Amino acid sequence: MNPNLAILLGLLPAVMLAGGALVCAALALVRPGTRTSLYRWITLLSTVAAFVASMLELTAMTHDATGVGAVDYQGGLIIDRFHVFGTVLVCGVVALTVLGAQAYLRRAAGRAGAFCALLLLSAAASSMLLAQREMAAFTVDFALLIACLVLLTAMTKTSGVTAEAAFRQVLSGGVALATAVYGLVLVYAATGTTDLSRLATGLRVDGTRVDPVLAVVGIGLVIVGLLIVVGAPPLQAWTRHIQEAAPGPIAGFSSALGVVTGVAVLSRYGVEGFGAGSSRWTVLVDVLAAVAMLSGGVLAIRASTIRRLIADLSIVQAGFLLLAAGATAKTISGQAAAGPTALLYALMAAATSLVAALLLAGIFDAAGLGTGLEAYRGAGRRSPTTAGFLALALLALAGLPPLAGFIARLLIAETALDAGAGWAVAAAAVATTLSGVALFRWLSVMYAEDENESPFAVTTTPLVSRVTAWTAAVLGLLLAAFAGPLLSIAGGGATALH
């Protein structure tokens, strides 16, 4: 591929998204009373433009069997199928969010421009994070992503809970960024370069051996820093605050974008930087995955509100994604690891289930229904359509059959077993059982008889937003029905990481 063309195509999706953000911000400043529908259209058009740019990037790599078009700026910009896959998934999350946020934008019309600008800017940061393995580029993009997600939560000024959540996000986000950057400093000291791929060679730029202690500690700190957007222990409080306090569209977007970006970046760094299958990082990731799955399952059993249930199930889900990210070693039979392929398919299922569950929970919030377990008693009979789709989204989030989340977890368990992490698979089985018990506790209440039911109407949320939320929930079924072709697409996206 022509180097100049490669750079242009690699930057184009992020430029389209950032350009849309700039237009929304400028319009909000120049014409404060602009209709919210115009901001939605700008956001959707920018997202479509980024998608088209990604397809152009993919077309330019048609003849590259490795799936890698070019690597420029010492790993600061990577044009490959993995970047294309991640960017398209991010665009899908943005589209679902802006279509599902109509009710929120009506209530906060004065902040619609800022909302859409932050959506697009955070998506641009995510796209750039997926296209690099260089320390300076990572620091700038990661800081921008954290800042945008914090501001999205802080925009909801009508609730003291969201203000507190935003403040806590600032604190935890600062800690995570500092942790990751300090880890990168140690890696730089060990390798003598900002290109993380040098770690995999085991040699510094001057030809001497990499200091193993600095490398291992640095890798560990980078991984821990990334966990803030993934939503896994020890930094799961970041996403829990968003999921419990923020409006449904913001909570769904931040959770889905964070998990897609964080796990995908970790997967790229692990394979291309830390060394595929290297125990320097896979052991830590497997341990963190087991802790996330078990702690999330236990917390889900005790969940007293619908938002906490979603947050706890998402912790379990984050653990499964980490398990897939760590399954990069060759199998016992010597074949290439299938972990990256399983991971990309699982990210599709994870993103759609998170967006769907939180959009649907937001619809019930807007209808005046409480968030507690008893408030949902009989909701399945009072609002059968929306409650049914919420149940579908929760089943997908919990990884139960016959939805895509279940298929993804089976694939992840298989790849983890092949990579020699059978003990982590055992923890995954326990966590899935706990998640199922917690979910069926809620579903039994949702479809129970209750003579003292308080009335509510989901029609307070516009039809477009409700249909979007229902569609996101149905995607769990569609991803399962077309698992074969989608796994082939995921395999193509993972080519660069094998």
Label for each model-derived stretch:
Residues M1-H498:
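Alpha-helical transmembrane segments of multi-pass membrane proteins predominantly involved
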